[in-house]
């Protein structure tokens, strides 16, 4: 909430950067604590479904940002009112959560620490799950940020149209989280994880080989659809296997989203050294 209110009341380049920093810190803390909290309040066999639905709600909130900014600019002459509205909503959410009674899973005499978190990386299964998040977040950010340039250079699509590839990808992701929330009530997390991973890998490979721009658009949509549920699936599968370490696992997986900063740099470097197809 502070990250949104600071740039609203003190709008300057420095304050916007400060607000971004606060938003990043706050968002990380919320996700580290909210994921295991959600697992505590939903039926055990529905954790993946509700985690996917939470990603859908998050996507809807992200999508509302641009049209709301346009509305406030047209109606009140100040798009920055968006900061105030989102800040107030954040405060209300904190108050609502603070007054809700939730019975958290606790183990007597056990406390999660930095040491206990990093010690879990010695477990091959947990390490593999954390690396999965590192890679999939990197692919998510890298593909989303480079899809426009890929369409321009690979298929000669006009820039304005090509840059809307991000919207196609985002729509696929949003639809994927909603569909995943429904399907995961009927399909096991492990089976869904296997098939959605296979779909994502096949579509990523296919988009490098196709010669048609129209087919590439379709594949971009399906890549978003496939990647959409990887995060909630990996988290729920890991917590299902190690339920007493859900806080540590949540922290490790939030640390693994650094893949979103590392892998896009690698994609850019390879693209500069050869071409964007090799980078992708």
What do these predicted ranges mean?
Residues 53-102:
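Helix-loop-helix hairpin linking two adjacent transmembrane segments in secondary transporters
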Residues 176-188, 271:
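Helix-to-loop junctions at the C-terminal end of transmembrane segments
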């Amino acid at each position: 909430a502070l990250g949104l209110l600071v740039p609203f009341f003190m709008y300057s380049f420095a304050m916007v950067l400060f607000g971004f920093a606060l938003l990043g810190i706050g968002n990380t803390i919320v996700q580290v604590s909210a994921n295991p909290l959600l697992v505590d309040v939903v039926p055990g066999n529905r954790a993946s479904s509700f985690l996917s639905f939470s990603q859908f709600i998050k996507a809807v909130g992200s999508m509302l940002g641009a049209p709301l900014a346009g509305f406030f600019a047209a109606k009140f002459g100040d798009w920055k009112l968006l900061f105030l509205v989102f800040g107030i909503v954040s405060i209300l959410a904190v108050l609502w959560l603070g007054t809700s009674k939730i019975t958290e899973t606790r183990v007597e005499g056990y406390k999660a620490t930095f040491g206990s978190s990093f010690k879990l990386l010695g477990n091959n299964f947990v390490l593999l799950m954390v690396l999965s998040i590192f890679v999939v977040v990197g692919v998510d950010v890298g593909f989303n940020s480079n899809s426009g340039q890929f369409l321009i250079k690979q298929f000669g699509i006009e820039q304005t149209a090509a840059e809307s590839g991000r919207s196609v990808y985002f729509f696929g992701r949003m639809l994927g989280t909603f569909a995943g929330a429904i399907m995961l009530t009927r399909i096991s997390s492990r089976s869904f994880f296997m098939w959605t991973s296979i779909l994502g890998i096949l579509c990523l490979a296919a988009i490098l080989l196709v010669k048609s721009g129209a087919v590439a658009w379709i594949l971009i949509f399906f890549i978003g659809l496939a990647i959409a549920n990887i995060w909630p699936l990996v988290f729920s599968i890991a917590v299902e296997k190690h339920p007493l370490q859900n806080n540590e696992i949540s922290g490790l997986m939030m640390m693994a989203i650094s893949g979103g900063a590392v892998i896009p740099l690698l994609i850019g470097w390879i693209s500069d050294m050869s071409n964007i197809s090799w980078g992708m």
